[in-house]
């Protein structure tokens, strides 16, 4: 039986490409999988997909790949270490960006560009960026290398042009909420981080604005409570941020027991939750851009603080400062089919989409695959790390 008589040489046969992701579903997989599938089809090669935290050192030694793909080389130390080790072992290395909506922190873009990579050195042979705006940011860094940094567009957003998502009836029936014909999604924020003294995100990103953001949590809790009470005919899908752990810092804690509320965290894909709603409301959420790609209206509810270190994506949604005006916007949508304040920002949204994700044509994965194919087939390894 050939399946039981294989030697070690067969078991550890060198693979063409080894891909590492942070999880088996969600953002990282959405980023790399369309590209991997195209590479498999175009090049007729073997690609092995592995969980980053399984044992990336063992996997690189075991499979001896010609090329390693890392969905993100800066977001956590393991991603960076996998990139460095693969390069050290002579593998060609390609990295994507998990969060490419860069912003300045303390007057610098360095933290967003390099994360844990304090040496600000690109260990990869090819780094694919979301937008030309990001590449211009990179040009201000000592780590910029025109031969390595290329523009593909944000591949993780291609799905909004290529795929179909769960319909409203299917999702609502699943949770026995199918009697509702009006659906509003409330997108959660990481208030957890703002109150956690051991987490650096709050102080680093917001500085003196932090207290206003903390106060916003309690205003949102009260505002959402009033909104839910006043609209029993609307289903509010409260989508907690996936990293929220402490219920005390959850903006939805006061509405959990209402019959017109569905609390979700990681049970459903965020794009399905967006797809079934009419309006998406958030304190601050880059998910708003994804809602635009699905032709949804978005509103930002900021009752305490409106100006802080926030994504440029916020400029594409009306900022509502009190519950009365939030209610008026919702009423306007359900009576007219639109919200004028939202419609007035159409040109802003088109510019934001270009600035943030590069392209919204569903072809970012094709551009990325073309760069990787060129590296795989033609180019010598660019990054050499001596042991």
Residue spans for each PLM region:
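Conserved catalytic-core segment of nucleotide-activated headgroup transferases in glycan assembly
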Residues: 158-252
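Alpha-helix C-terminal capping/helix-to-coil transition sites in glycosyltransferase folds
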Residues: 7, 64, 123, 275-276
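Single conserved hydrophobic/aromatic residue that forms the stacking wall/gate
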Residues: 1-12, 385-386
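C-terminal amphipathic helix plus adjacent low-complexity
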Residues: 329-385
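A donor-sugar binding/catalytic signature common to diverse glycosyltransferases
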Residues: 139, 143, 266-312
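Nucleotide-activated donor-binding/catalytic signature segment of Leloir-type glycosyltransferases, i.e.
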Residues: 250-266
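Active-site and donor-binding regions of nucleotide-sugar-utilizing enzymes
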Residues: 18-163, 189, 288
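Nucleotide-sugar donor-binding patch of glycosyltransferase catalytic domains
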Residues: 148, 293-342
């Amino acid at each position: 039986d050939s399946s039981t008589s294989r030697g070690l040489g067969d078991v550890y046969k060198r693979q063409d490409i080894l891909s590492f992701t942070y999880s088996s579903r969600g953002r990282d997989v959405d980023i790399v999988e369309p590209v991997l599938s195209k590479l498999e089809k175009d090049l007729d090669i073997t690609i092995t997909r592995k969980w980053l935290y399984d044992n990336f050192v063992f996997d690189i030694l075991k499979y001896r790949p010609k090329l390693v793909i890392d969905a993100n080389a800066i977001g956590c130390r393991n991603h960076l270490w996998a990139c460095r080790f693969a390069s050290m072992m002579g593998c060609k290395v390609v990295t994507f960006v998990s969060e490419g909506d860069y912003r300045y922190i303390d007057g610098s873009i360095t933290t967003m560009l390099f994360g844990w990579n304090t040496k600000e050195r690109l260990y990869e042979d090819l780094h694919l960026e979301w937008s030309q705006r990001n590449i211009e940011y990179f040009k201000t860094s000592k780590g910029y290398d025109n031969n390595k940094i290329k523009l593909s567009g944000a591949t993780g957003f291609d799905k909004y042009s290529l795929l179909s998502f769960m319909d409203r009836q299917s999702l609502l029936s699943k949770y026995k909420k199918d009697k509702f014909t009006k659906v509003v999604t409330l997108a959660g924020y990481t208030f957890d981080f703002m109150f956690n003294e051991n987490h650096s995100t709050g102080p680093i990103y917001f500085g003196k604005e932090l207290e206003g953001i903390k106060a916003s949590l309690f205003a949102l809790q009260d505002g959402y409570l009033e909104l839910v009470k006043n609209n029993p005919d609307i289903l509010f899908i409260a989508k907690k941020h996936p990293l929220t752990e402490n219920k005390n810092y959850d903006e939805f804690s006061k509405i959990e027991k209402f019959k017109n509320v569905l609390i979700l965290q990681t049970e459903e894909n965020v794009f399905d939750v967006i797809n079934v709603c009419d309006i998406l409301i958030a304190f601050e959420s880059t998910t708003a851009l994804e809602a635009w790609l699905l032709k949804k209206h978005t509103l930002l509810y900021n009752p305490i603080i409106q100006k802080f270190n926030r994504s440029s994506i916020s400029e594409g949604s009306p900022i509502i400062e009190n519950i009365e005006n939030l209610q008026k916007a919702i009423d306007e949508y359900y009576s007219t089919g639109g919200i004028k304040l939202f419609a007035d920002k159409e040109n802003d949204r088109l510019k934001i989409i270009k600035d943030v994700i590069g392209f919204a044509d569903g072809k970012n994965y094709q551009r990325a695959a073309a760069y990787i194919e060129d590296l795989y087939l033609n180019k010598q390894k660019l990054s050499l790390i001596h042991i």
